[in-house]
């Protein structure tokens, strides 16, 4: 076994792997702190990832990186943290998360933000960020599992808003209620197999849906799309009063 310790979303994790690739992937998140929990990958875990994969030619070391993140995602609800499928960008110190079905253009849209806003914007994670629910709000956190363009930053920023993207000829964005947003949130977050972790995930999603603002946007691939999205999503938002039975202290 090859062992390394890494800090993701404020949680310290020991990783025991069969291949070195996952440790290379996570090197910018290395930590010397005492682990909060550990994950160990077996050959069976790698075979299971191969069965899930749409491609049959994926190398074992890559499949192992996915197995590691799956095990981390299974454990993270205990630390008030969710794995989410989306592209997260930070602008002026606030996080904005775009989610949609694969191929819609999440990465293209956040690229437009970087082009329009320049140095004011940077990527938090372009594919699978972590969302940490705290007593002070929701944080969006970088991870090394950052998509085919490998765009991420080892950082944690307050999550301002979430937008569900759809392709359109014109750029139109509208706020949606937490009740409207919840099905999309559930679809795009990792749903643990363990009952306890899944129920905790539902609680955290309920809190998230009452804390941040949600929008639905139909957009094209023009620079105007970024300006329209930011103008709406950066507006003041009054959160609903919705707290889970337990949330993390943000300072943890």
Model feature map: region roles:
Residues 106:
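Conserved lysine of the Walker
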């Amino acid at each position: 076994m090859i062992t390394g310790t890494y800090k993701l979303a404020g949680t310290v994790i020991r990783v025991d792997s069969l291949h070195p690739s996952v440790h290379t992937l996570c090197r910018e998140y290395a930590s010397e702190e005492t682990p909060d929990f550990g994950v160990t990958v077996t050959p069976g875990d790698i075979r299971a990832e191969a069965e899930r994969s749409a491609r049959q030619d994926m190398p074992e070391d890559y499949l192992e990186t996915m197995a590691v993140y799956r095990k981390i995602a299974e454990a993270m609800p205990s630390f008030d943290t969710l794995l989410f499928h989306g592209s997260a960008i930070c602008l002026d110190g606030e996080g904005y998360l775009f989610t949609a079905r694969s191929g819609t253009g999440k990465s293209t849209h956040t690229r437009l933000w970087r082009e329009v806003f320049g140095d004011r914007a940077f990527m938090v994670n372009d594919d699978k960020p972590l969302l940490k629910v705290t007593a002070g709000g929701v944080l969006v956190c970088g991870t090394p599992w950052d998509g085919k363009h490998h765009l991420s930053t080892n950082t944690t920023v307050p999550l301002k808003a979430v937008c569900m993207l759809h392709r359109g000829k014109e750029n139109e964005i509208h706020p949606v209620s937490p009740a409207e947003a919840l099905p999309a949130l559930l679809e795009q977050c990792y749903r643990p197999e363990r009952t306890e972790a899944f129920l905790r995930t539902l609680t955290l999603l309920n809190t998230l849906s009452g804390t941040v603002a949600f929008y639905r946007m139909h957009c094209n691939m023009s620079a105007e799309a970024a300006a329209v999205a930011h103008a709406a999503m950066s507006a003041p938002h009054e959160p609903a009063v919705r707290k889970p039975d337990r949330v993390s202290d943000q300072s943890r």
